[in-house]
Amino acid sequence: MRRFDAVIAGAGAAGMFCAVQLGWRGKSVAVIEHSGCQGRKLMITGKGRCNVTNNCTADTVMKNIPRNSKFMYSALSRFAPEDVMSFFECLGVELKTERGNRVFPVSDNAKDIVKALVKACEDSGVQFIDDEVKELIIKDGRAEGFKCEHGDYYADSVIVATGGKSYPRTGSTGDGYRLAKSVGHKVTAITPSLCPVVTYEREECAPAMGLSLRNCTLTLREEDRDKPIFHELGEMLFTHFGLSGPLVLSASAHLGDMNKSRYYMDIDLKPALSHEQLDSRILRDFGDFPNRDFQNSLGKLLPSKIIPLIIKRCGIDPEKKVNQITREERERLVSTVKKLTFTVKCMRPVEEAIITRGGVDVSQIDPRSMESKLCKGLYFIGEVLDVDAYTGGFNLQIAFSTAYSCADKIG
């Protein structure tokens, strides 16, 4: 039997951060990781650059958490984005802030974040154990450790930091949900979040595959609801199956059960122009070359890859001379550019999602300490909890803030 002050399942962002904080407080800590590699998911976040947080206030982080944001109030009050930045700079990682207040290592290399966390763990006496957690060890209603494939590990504090189900090749297999259920915790429905979407118009999207649009707006609507669910300016990407990119990923966090309702994504390709201003711009372009075919007249206005789609949607003969286009046809063109609508069929599989929506029901977790309300000595931190946010470093902030609250309570 091996005993520690704290034992943590999962060597991801939350698990290693919590281990460092406990080690700094003089606790003996073991981190159990079955994948044989620390921080595997961290290595691929931010396209391999690792968007560690967002350089904003705690209130702004709260606004970027679409569900259960109140649960995070205490944790964010105690460990805000500025604290995350100070932590990594203290470990020798230089940081920079980019567009949208996204914070990255100056090196643009996620490995530097992982190496810093691993070294901080080792320097504070944390032991990494290559083993697979099978079940919790419970005695008299209290968590006492983990029963693993190659042995049992006991501790005064037992911490589940196993992540969600996204990117399972990195070790995120959803084991934490099974552990939570074993002691009576409710686990809300697990679905993809921050995930590309498949559209019914995928054949229209395919020719534009690879096209990245900047400074467009995306509005997400649900059928039979007057008020939009989501509206934001940013970037998006056309794929062979539909839509992706930051705007689409953030909008996906608001998608519900697509068997019960239909969702639409409206893209405004020229949000800086009103309908009247766009019409004037088109008239000017048409006037410059009045004898051009319509299909050859939109190059100044739109990226070439999307022009065939716009022509098809607005229903204007592509070979029609622009000096013959009627006002009604021009209005259809303006409306199409200002509201290019796609119908969401489904999200891509959870394996392709950046994070998981759903998890351990936070109503059964103490928001000040992340301790289970059902089982003393048991804690849940990071993505295993039913809290998720938009892109921009907010999800890693959740991981670090929940881990800090846990360590602060134990330490």
Task: Name these PLM-found stretches.
Residues 129-142:
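A conserved short coil-to-beta-strand element within the FAD-binding core of flavoproteins
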Residues 23-47:
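Glycine-rich FAD pyrophosphate-binding loop
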Residues 129-132, 308-388:
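A glycine-rich dinucleotide-binding beta-alpha-beta segment and adjacent secondary-structure elements
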Residues 36-38, 43-44, 58-59, 94, ...:
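An anion/pyrophosphate-binding glycine-rich loop and adjacent beta-alpha core
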Residues 157-203:
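Glycine-rich loop(s) and the adjacent beta-strand/alpha-helix scaffold that form part
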Residues 7-9, 32, 133, 146, ...:
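Short hydrophobic core segments
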Residues 4-31, 406-410:
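N-terminal Rossmann-like FAD-binding beta1-loop-alpha1 element of flavoenzymes
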Residues 49-97:
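Glycine-rich active-site loop/strand segments that organize a redox cofactor
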